[in-house]
Amino acid sequence: MAKIKARDLRGKKKEELLKQLEDLKVELSQLRVAKVTGGAASKLSKIRVVRKSIARVLTVINQTQKENLRKFYKGKKYKPLDLRPKKTRAMRRRLNKHEENLKTKKQQRKERLYPLRKYAVKA
């Protein structure tokens, strides 16, 4: 089987991808048997190509799965941990913009009663 391109895989359905993955795994096992029994050099060099193709298929499957999950959870209140932004622990616990701008009743009253003084400079 020739080297598979990821862009060709992205258009396929999940069932097709799983079937292709199964075919690649069967081919890999046959190549490994050929390696043990002393197969041709062309078969031995093909093992690497097939392994990388399997990795490509799995990568495309996982990426599309994650993309679909992102679409599903978009706008929902709770998301799985792996779909939330990573950031650092401290950044995740930090107050958000709205919480930072909140003021207590006492602070609001003080600002209303004692506004900032405006001075005019005499030229």
From Swiss-Prot:
Domain of life from the UniProt record: Eukaryota
Primary location recorded for the protein, binned into one broad class: cytoplasm
HAMAP family per UniProt: Ribosomal_uL29
Pfam families, sorted: Ribosomal_L29
One GO cellular component term noted in the UniProt record for this chain: cytosolic large ribosomal subunit
Gene3D superfamilies xref list: 1.10.287.310, 6.10.250.3450
Coiled-coil ranges from the UniProt annotation: none
A Gene Ontology molecular function term of the record: structural constituent of ribosome
Annotated InterPro entries: Ribosomal_uL29, Ribosomal_uL29_CS, Ribosomal_uL29_euk, Ribosomal_uL29_sf
Subunit details: Component of the large ribosomal subunit.
Annotated spans, Disordered: 95-114
Name under which the protein is recorded: Large ribosomal subunit protein uL29
Gene encoding the protein: RPL35
Alphabetical GO biological process terms: maturation of LSU-rRNA from tricistronic rRNA transcript (SSU-rRNA, 5.8S rRNA, LSU-rRNA); translation
Matches recorded under NCBIfam families: L29
Crosslinked positions (Glycyl lysine isopeptide (Lys-Gly) (interchain with G-Cter in SUMO2)): 25
N6-acetyllysine found at: 19, 43
